[in-house]
């Protein structure tokens, strides 16, 4: 498909709602089908930068217009503190995309983290460019906190040295459901569901290691960079973080023929759900707790929609549901189920108020 066709396809389908948010308003199923069958080869990437953006709304509009024309899909969050982008770009339009990024002073030289692996299904099937208060939700309200006062970067080679050093502490700054399917050897993996929660507990959790060397890591670098600044703000002196996160670590290991210290898969927030970093399966099915599995599913009961790990046997036995309660609930009349939609959280039965199941570690 030629570049001009992207303008027709995507301009016609993207509805500009407000200066804060531009979204494709077609039904979810229609969007997924259209992208899945369009035959366009895409490059999945992520990038972020903590940089002062004077007018996030205008910046949002400019990016949305250009990304729409180029046929880009994904989630791009913009705030006064910077930009956080997870997206894919039609390969045929990559040079135009890269040239556009370089026209933005705020983005010149921003490093791209290219996906470790592309899968059969596209990583994204819609484009969202949105203005937010923060590019990654942190729950912090301390006006004296300087997000730019970060720890130094660690290369993959240096990070491996930290992993091997008994006097160093390696900390996973991702959520528990992410580290469950993959993490670095000997890493501290806090049992939290959100980055906001982890920032809250990290200073207390790590205070016994305050005088040690601390190395932080996350998916692509955005969370551990902010976390390094937060720990320094709380009196930690020797804090560093993995440059480019797990994604770039994998690329560095391959380029430099280094030992891979990451075990399992890297959870990603797109349609792929994960990328293979190590060869091991380290997690277990949440339904039986006996069979190893690193494949995530969402419960077919939309009132639940919990994220869980399932083995082939349990998925077949429960038909894609996380429990027999959900199987039973989903057989209720449609009028009854409407009372318990995902958007009516306070009305849900107690068993549907959880976000995800945590299984055997």
Predicted ranges, named:
Residues 1-16:
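N-terminal amphipathic/basic-hydrophobic helices that include classical n-h-c signal peptides
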Residues 12, 17-152, 165, 175-213, ...:
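Rhodanese-like catalytic fold shared by cysteine-dependent sulfurtransferases
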Residues 155-160:
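Phosphate-interacting basic helix/loop segments used at nucleotide- and nucleic-acid interfaces
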Residues 170-172:
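Structural scaffold elements adjacent to functional motifs in cytosolic proteins
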Residues 219:
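Substrate-contacting helices/loops that form the catalytic groove of nucleic-acid
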């Amino acid at each position: 498909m030629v570049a001009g066709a992207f303008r027709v396809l995507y301009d016609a389908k993207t509805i500009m709602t407000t200066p804060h948010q531009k979204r494709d308003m077609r039904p979810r199923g229609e969007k997924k089908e259209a992208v899945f069958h369009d035959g366009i080869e895409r490059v999945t990437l992520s990038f972020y930068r903590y940089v002062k953006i004077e007018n996030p709304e205008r910046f949002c509009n400019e990016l949305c217009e250009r990304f729409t024309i180029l046929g880009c899909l994904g989630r791009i969050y913009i705030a006064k503190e910077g930009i956080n982008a997870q997206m894919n770009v039609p390969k045929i339009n990559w040079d135009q995309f890269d040239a556009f990024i370089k026209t933005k002073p705020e983005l010149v030289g921003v490093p791209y983290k290219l996906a470790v692996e592309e899968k059969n299904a596209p990583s994204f099937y819609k484009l969202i460019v949105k203005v937010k208060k923060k590019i990654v939700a942190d729950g912090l309200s301390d006006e004296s906190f300087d997000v730019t006062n970060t720890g130094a970067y660690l290369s993959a080679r240096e990070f491996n040295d930290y992993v091997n050093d008994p006097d160093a502490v390696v900390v996973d700054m991702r959520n528990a459901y992410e580290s469950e399917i993959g993490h670095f050897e000997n890493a501290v993996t806090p049992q939290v569901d959100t980055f906001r929660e982890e920032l809250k507990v990290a200073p207390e959790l790590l205070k016994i290691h305050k005088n040690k060397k601390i190395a932080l890591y996350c998916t692509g670098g955005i969370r551990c960079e902010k976390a390094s600044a937060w720990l320094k703000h709380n009196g930690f002196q020797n804090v560093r973080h993995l440059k480019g996160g797990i994604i770039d670590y994998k690329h560095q290991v391959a380029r430099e023929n280094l030992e891979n210290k990451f075990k399992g898969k890297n959870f990603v927030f797109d349609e792929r759900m994960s990328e293979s970093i190590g060869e091991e399966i380290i997690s277990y099915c949440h339904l039986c707790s006996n069979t190893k599995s690193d494949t995530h599913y969402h419960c077919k009961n939309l009132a639940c929609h919990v994220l869980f790990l399932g083995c082939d046997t349990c998925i077949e036995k429960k038909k894609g549901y996380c429990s027999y309660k959900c199987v039973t609930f989903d057989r209720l009349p449609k009028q009854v189920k409407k009372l318990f939609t995902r958007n009516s959280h306070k009305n849900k039965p107690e068993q549907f108020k959880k976000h995800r199941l945590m299984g055997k570690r």
